[in-house]
């Protein structure tokens, strides 16, 4: 009885049609394609770091060429994120992966860590490229096209240390004062962010725990195959049965490993990305409130400084325009982000559910096939005795 011949026909899952559903309709008008790949390790006397190759292909007229290739390190991505937040304080900037080592990893720059970060950086740049406003940001263009020396020179053109410190001080002062009359729609938005943050963090923890338990289950199960093989050597009457069980366990181990890969590639990164998004949203709301707080302080000052009415009136007019622009930008980006979030999470959970169904179908079919073969054994022995 050859247990390697077990290849049970897997029933076609009715959920396979889900793969045919497209959540985002509309014509493909993409004209900017970005790939992050080819990580390289660099060791100096001061530090060790990784750079990634970024290949950009585009048909946009504002670019000097149709294809660019540069190398960037994580600090460059941080710089880009900061410049985008500075230029568009109330737009929802995609999150970067954490700078420090992910919990549970032994080596900071092992292959799994580097590949996980590469995927996250790739998604970060492509989310910016797909954003209707951020994609045309000048700093983003420079990031994609400038060589290392050019980028270093470009960075030095930004605001000086004192200017950045002044912005930070004003931001802290505004946060201490707090916003007095936040519009109702932004109160609702803030409540949504708080609730979403709590739930997505809980989902992230549960997902990580499920993956850990799945890993422990897999590590334990893969030991049972060899145990049954050794057992069969001392049980002559049960050789075929024990070897058959070992074969089934091996097949279930392969199915479990595939399921774990699906969790680590399809579900865990998406859920964790939206954990980081929830933190980004808190920052966006603070920056919106800061703009409104500046307006409120000028209005309040106007009541005490009659002599400077004309100057304050002009400043108030500018701040009213700034608040209106900030509110409109955030409201438009908020709806876009919510739709993307729903699509991403729905797709991640749907894919995971379908993978789970396939996993259980495969394991069930494996054991059913084995049990059927064992049920047929007595009749075969009886027929041999009759002969």
Curated annotation (Swiss-Prot):
Entry binding sites for a 1,2-diacyl-sn-glycero-3-phospho-(1D-myo-inositol-3-phosphate): 73, 75, 103, 117
Domain named BAR: residues: 178-387
A molecular function (GO) term: phosphatidylinositol binding
Predominant cellular place of this UniProt entry's protein: membrane
This protein's UniProt keywords: Endosome, Lipid-binding, Membrane, Protein transport, Transport
Gene Ontology terms: cellular component: early endosome; early endosome membrane
Superkingdom field: Eukaryota
Name the UniProt record assigns to this protein: Sorting nexin-7
Originating species: Mus musculus
Gene symbol of the encoding locus: Snx7
